[in-house]
Amino acid sequence: MCLDRCFLWRKKRKQRLLEKLIPSAKDGGAAIFAPFYCEYGVNIHFGKGCFVNYKCTFLDCAPITLEDGVWVGANVTIATPCHPFLSDERLPQQYPDGFHDLEYAKPIHIGSGSWICSSATICGGVTIGKNCIVAAGAVVTRDVPDNCIVAGVPAKVLRKLDEQDRMQVWDTYMKNEVPMSERERGRK
């Protein structure tokens, strides 16, 4: 299903289609920007306050679960399908109803508060812990513990997140700001 052709002036229609495709997207479960691609939709489960940026692909042959507050950057692929490693096992086999290739799927679970940055790929069978960051372009093939930053191909844990990572908004951005009333008068 592609929501690419559902323009902003059809916002209600887009939301109805999305809720039909992904029932957990109802009631604030997710904000999803088009285009969005998925295989089935019914195997995708959103917690509250999830955000999915544009051009994401969710191949949901098995369940994909995003807990509360998960952010997914642009062009991310979350793919549950897996294929055999050996080439002769990947070849289509003849069955009574025709030729088929061997494919199986493993679920993916992403913990609350995690952020999957742009162009990352999450492979089947992976569990990403709570409050994790998956760096842009990373390919996650193994489980990620809570409160970690992972990056690379394949993704590896760079370090644990801690209190020193907390953004100091006042010190960083507001310290040298001039109050609005003085700025309007042109004074510093």
Predicted regions and their residues:
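A generic membrane alpha-helix/interface feature
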Residues: 93, 148, 170-172
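Arg/Lys-rich RNA-binding interfaces used to dock onto structured RNA substrates
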Residues: 29-35
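Aromatic-residue hotspot detector
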Residues: 23, 35-36
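Flexible, glycine/small-residue-enriched loop-and-beta-strand segment within the central core
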Residues: 36-46, 51-127, 153, 160-162, ...
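Terminal amphipathic alpha-helical/low-complexity segments used for targeting or macromolecular assembly
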Residues: 1-29, 85, 153-188
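C-terminal/domain-terminus segments
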Residues: 121-151, 155
